[in-house]
């Protein structure tokens, strides 16, 4: 782990001491080298001797998420250049250093082997994200969005802290490996039911489950591009990763405690997909589609079958890349037209023809068309939920149809139609933007050739 952590930490002095004309170039190239080097940790075998120490370890569940975190840092830096062009150099350095600190916290969170360490790092990610949203957001509502983000996350995670301290006093350890090997089935009584809720609530808020999702559209809409990318691609995955880690020690009461949450997740997918059909704000639509896709991950994780865990892991990686790409595309429009309203950015196919091809590919990936990894994740989740209850096939089928409708609605509204008068004199697309889209799309397609790399612990 130190082979990735120490170079990432050294980004901080690099950003501080680089000459002002070299800050963007140095940070982009260096972070791209770190992300390339992190690919060596991808093919994790069950023998973790080389990777294991008392504090941090990577296995086949955490290594895909670690690499996703490393992969997105250079893309966030590249995507933020135009946004910060007119800022003073001190503000640019602060912004980049916040992204690096967030990256370090995420790498340590995904590789932590103690649950209390995971909790501390889970909360640590809140601080740089909140500063990025509240300081560099576009509208005055960013402070309101930051408050929503802060209070939802804190109120959801306080019961988790109490539950972890209780488990520590009962079992004497919060080490992930020891907890999975300790035969301690929870008895069916009301106190253990409350313990289950306390453990799961923080992760369900972070995912977010429908009903706890109100902070997400606000935070996404008001965040700058790097904030939206890291929120959609990685921070939501902290919730899914936490569920997959902690649900093993909550047996056997998960079997009936999870029922209402699985139903809420599948129903929430339909509701949030339907909300997408009524959105006029482009970033808000992409944010609600994230809630819909995360509903699939929640349902698959709580059903607790090997296929469910594999489907949830694949969906998390696929959604991270797809939603980040969609936010980058929305940002390219915003940089030129200074509006997120879809009616005002219509007809861009005539002005930016190559960018419209990226829009088409991102929309197809969002609705899970082959050859993207989204398809493999969605198929596994659909099979899992169908084996749990036949009725869920109707809900998931309806969700797939609505997802296809709003994806094409978004594509047609933004790219087709009559060009508005203020869109006639916009800047052409840049090589930087095409590189960002390529680096998002390549993993989505190439992972289909060898999906076992991201299918997690239960792949055999």
Curated annotation (Swiss-Prot):
According to the UniProt entry, what is the EC number of this protein?
7.1.1.2
Q: Where are the transmembrane segments?
A: 22-42, 65-85, 96-116, 117-137, 147-167, 194-214, 230-250, 256-276, 284-303, 308-330, 350-370, 373-393, 394-414, 435-455
**Which residue pairs form cystines in this protein?**
none
**What cellular component GO annotations does this protein have?**
mitochondrial inner membrane; respiratory chain complex I
Alphabetical list of Pfam families matching this protein: Oxidored_q5_N, Proton_antipo_M
Q: How does it assemble?
A: Core subunit of respiratory chain NADH dehydrogenase (Complex I) which is composed of 45 different subunits.
Sum up the protein's function in the record's words. Answer: Core subunit of the mitochondrial membrane respiratory chain NADH dehydrogenase (Complex I) which catalyzes electron transfer from NADH through the respiratory chain, using ubiquinone as an electron acceptor. Essential for the catalytic activity and assembly of complex I.
Q: What is this protein called?
A: NADH-ubiquinone oxidoreductase chain 4
- Record the organism: Ornithorhynchus anatinus
